[in-house]
Amino acid sequence: MPVSSGIDHAEQQRLNRALVIDSLRRQGCCSRAELARLTNLKRATITNIIGEFIDLGLVVETEFLSSEGGRRSIGLRINGRRYQVIGVMITRKYYCIVRIGLSGEVYALKCHQIPAEIGVEDLVLSMEHNIHKMIAENPETRIMAIGFAVPGPYLQKEGEVAFITNLEGWDEFPISAKLQEAFDIPVLLSNDANAAAYASYWYDAQNEKNSNLVYIVAGQGIGCGLLSNGRLVQGAMGIAGEIGHTSIDFHGPKCACGNRGCLELYCSLLVLENRIKQRLLQGEASCLTADFTTRDLAEAIRQGDPLALEEYERNCGYLVVGIVNLINQFNPSTIVIGDQLVDLAPELLLRLVREQVRERLRPAIWEGLNIEVDQSEYNPIVMGAAALAAQTILEDPFSY
């Protein structure tokens, strides 16, 4: 809807531009008349704003589009080939770099393994090198911003990761400042689960189904991103949604966060793999060997290997406890579960989670809830990191 009165003219212009470009991004391609209908802005206002975007090279005209009345209109789309952003996802074992247009289309994606012995300083240098390399490979493209998604609680004000379980050297490391020094364009950092949650919202053309959403990242660690009315809920320090560090056993083992019995100590890909390896060393029968890979584990679960299946279902049971706690705390309309635990056996995980969550909820709450798994073509964390960078530019493109 158009911007209301009570703000100065310059701010009203900025907000109207942001409204128009975001509507065009969600539609992919549409006419000036369609933009006027979608935004409730006057046709003259749309014409002026689109004219500015075309002069900037941000928007281009395309082929004629057919309308319901039979009249043809010139199509418009964001010039994603010229204006792009980069997203980076950091995990405990690898990092990925994606290059997307401002409207979300993917142009390049590369992943790099993180050697076990590498320190955080050298890891940052490695990422800088490969990002600069990706930028240099496309001199005709202008990279507008870079978004990074990091595991663990990210302290926004300090620009630091508080800690990452099973990974040393990150505590109080000034990653935001280090990365900002390396690039002369805006650099944005977010928690990985927040990035994934934002991806589920940003890439949804209508933005309606996922406006109140919990996205659970179930991979090498456990975290969640919270969306309320389309906005990330981050808390006072930016660490809201750390489901992995909620206790499911107050007599449980001590966690690196200081708590006891944290969900992440019972449920994650790393925990699953370690439990299976311990049982293999004790001589239990399985089609897996002690040096199994994640792909081997997925195949063992698919084949119904008793050991792999038992431990996977055990992981899912712990995950259910965390999910039910989230439902009772935040009352989301949609819960999306993604990352490596899901990738192992998406249909099985979804069935187990739905069955067990339903048993733990009142019928009225269950009936208003949608639980799904993320099987997107691209990893939602890296895509969310890029989306956050893109949205920053789109909210005020003339400032960059």
Residue ranges: model-predicted function:
Residues 109-111, 119-123, 171, 180-302:
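Glycine/GP-enriched mid-protein hinge/lid loop-to-helix segment characteristic of carbohydrate kinases
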Residues 153-156, 194-197, 223-224, 233, ...:
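Short, active-site-adjacent cap segments at secondary-structure transitions
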Residues 101, 156, 227:
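Short, acidic, Ser/Thr-enriched surface-loop or helix-capping motifs
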